[in-house]
Amino acid sequence: VREIVVHDWQARAGIDVAALAAFLGRALGVDASPVSGGAGMRPDGAGGALGACRVADVKRPFWRQRGEAPRDGGVALYDGHELLRLALAVAGPGASPRGALHVMVTDLLVGTYDDADARYHARPVVASNPSLLSTASAVWGPARSRRYYGEAMAARASGGDGAAVEAAHAAEHLVEGDARMAAAIRGYAMQAAMYALTGEAFCDDDSCCLHDAHWQSGVLSAVASGQLCAAHGAAIGGLT
């Protein structure tokens, strides 16, 4: 990877792509630059192609539901692999293994289908070239604490104050518009970059920003730290 280009695909995402590019450039010792505007990700800028990426049924793989209308209600979920096809068109011919790594930041909820449990899961990062980073998926993908879910269920069952439960646990997980989102996205961007450099995005060390955190606590303690473990720090040093 000679260069990293960070694209703002959605102005509402609230991520400073210039700051993100600068972080990646410093961390990896490569040239990095931002591209703002995001026209390629808005429905009016995608020629209707964006709507064709929307998931109609979270319990079926995309190829079995292609062309079906999404069910009414709920948050729109988009297939990550289909979005990558759009991203490739936005990024241009330089988005190749021998060219620049293009990192696309969006606030769309992005997911991929998992054959292991036959359903879609929200993915904060879909590592490829281009790679996708989703702020919405960083909120809704990693699980919140068991205590939070228990208290939220109890509040619903009793007609209690769900807002009070949210407030009590606000520090434990990311929410939309969270000031900690920029740090989390930096960690996910490092995962995308590591995949481009080595073919492996994740780390088993739960203190490393490359850790594949399935819980919000791990996102905040590891991914958002921006810190590499000793092994990956050395690996980056040897690659750049």
Give names to the regions the model predicted.
Residues 13-34:
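Zn2+-dependent metallopeptidase catalytic core
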Residues 1-14, 103:
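Short hydrophobic beta-strand segments
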Residues 38-204, 212-213:
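Metzincin-family zinc-dependent endopeptidase catalytic domain
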Residues 4-6, 24, 133:
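Hydrophobic beta-strand residues in large extracellular and virion-surface proteins
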Residues 9, 35-38:
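Conserved beta-strand termini and adjacent loop/short-helix elements that scaffold enzyme active sites
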